[in-house]
Structures are given as structure tokens and as C-alpha cells.
Amino acid sequence: ANMLMLSSSLQQENESQEHPGVHQVPGADDPKGLGPDVEPIVNKYQPNCLFYHNVNRADLRWGGSESGTVGYPCWSSFPYPYSHSNATDGVTDHNKLLAHGDPNGKFWVPAMADTPLRGYNGRHEWFWEPGDDDKAVYPLANLMEMYEKSVGRNATLMVGLTPNPDGVIPEGDVRRLQEWGAEINRRFGQPLAATSATGKKKVSLSLGKVQPVNYYLIQEDITGGERIRAYRVEAQVNGKWTTVAKGTSVGHKRIESFPAVEAKSFRLVVEECTAEPLIRNFSVYHVN
């Protein structure tokens, strides 16, 4: 197929290293409806392969749209083992489950948010077409919004790239991807302060001095599952703890902005959890 899929390495960086040899089969079915016949062949020769968005089996969950975003909250757990199958697509509220998952689900089916890079100005191109130009490429601001509403909501962001007839990604697309990576690193590469904790429901950060802050990032150690059910982030302003953000799902990564506050100390307060919290990362940033 004349298409490449690029998954955000920042979302599943550790998971991919922990599970070498795991590959992915996209979900498009054979034109004759023979897609399910591929499954036993794949299972025989690549038993660790994951299926994505296939009508017979989907180990990875489509987030419900091709906008590059998912809803919030977004849980990685799900009530049945495949997000799509002929047996479950008729389930009540199926589309809601795709977007949000189920905090009490018994199966680990993380969400993917997909979008073509060339989806701007009324275009939505998963494949290269004659006459294509850079005007179809999403602006950087749109891509950053997608990042925060996918990776920042506990999903993997998957971006469709379109090789041209020479078999290469167009130069304009490459430049935009480079700009995107640089902007992600600029915003979130150097936290003002960061920490981790095990078993604590209050996790504090000291910035050393009063500074403006307008973003936070939380990560759970998902080898222990998603344990947090509700939390808040507080800033100590004029000696008083003030709530600057509240949320529910965290999972692999939660990134959110809030109106800038100037403070020296911040803390994460876990209001509800299913077991002791495993905080892999709690950090704050100032993005301008």
C-alpha cells in the first residue's frame, strides 16, 4: 500500500523496548471480505503480532475518529478482549467505549488516535495523489493540539504519511515532522521540576524559587495497571494550597495545560485509587 504509519515514540517508548518483536497489522479488510482468513497465518508465523482495527479482531483500540485525538477520560482497560470484532460491534455504547475505554474493564486494550498528516484545508489523504501540495499538511499548532489530546490523554498517536511516486516522503512533510518533534522537545523536554513516588497519595515538587507554571505531566507505572481514578494538582500560592487542575484517568501519560500561576511548590493529590499509586513521573513546565 502507498502509505506509511508513524506511531508516536514518546507514547510507547518504554513499552516497545520491553516487547521486542511485537509487530502490528493494520485493520483494512480484504476487498473480498477475506480479512479474517489472515489471522491463523499471522498467528502461526508471528504469534506476538497485534491486530489494529480489524472487523474480526482488534488488539489495539481505535479511538473513534481520524482526528488524531481521543476523548477524556481515556482508560486503557476494556470490557472485552478486542475493541472490534463481529461479535461485539453491536454492543450498546460501543462508540463511547472506543473513545473512553472502561476503568473497570478486565482487558488491556489501549487506545490509538490516528490521522493523516495531509488532513488540512478540507483534505484527508491517507494516500498520495497527483497534484498534492504542502497546503494539505497540518500546521504545527494543529499537530501540537493533537499531541496533547492523544499522547497527553493516554493514547498512542499514529500519523499517516504518504510516499510520493519516487517512494519518498515529500520534503514539506519531512520538514513539518522535524518541526513537530522539535516543538514537543521544546515544550516538554526540560521540566522545571520532576519526581516519582510509590505508595504516596500526596507527591510534592519544589521549584527552588517562585516561577510561572502552566503545564503538568503525570505518568503511572502501567506495569501495575491504571490505579488512579481521580486526582488534583495544587500550587502553593501565598502560603495556601490552591487547586489548578483536576482529572480522572492518567495511565501512561497525562499532559494538561492550565492558566499560568506563579509558585514555588506544587503537589499531586491522588483523591481516589484502586491500589497504592505508582507515580512514574510528576513534573511541571512553563510553555510560552
Predicted features along the sequence, with ranges:
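Short, conserved beta-strand segments of beta-strand-rich sandwich/propeller modules, principally
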Residues: 265-267
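Mature catalytic domains of secreted/periplasmic carbohydrate-active enzymes
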Residues: 1-238, 243-258, 269-272, 276-280, ...
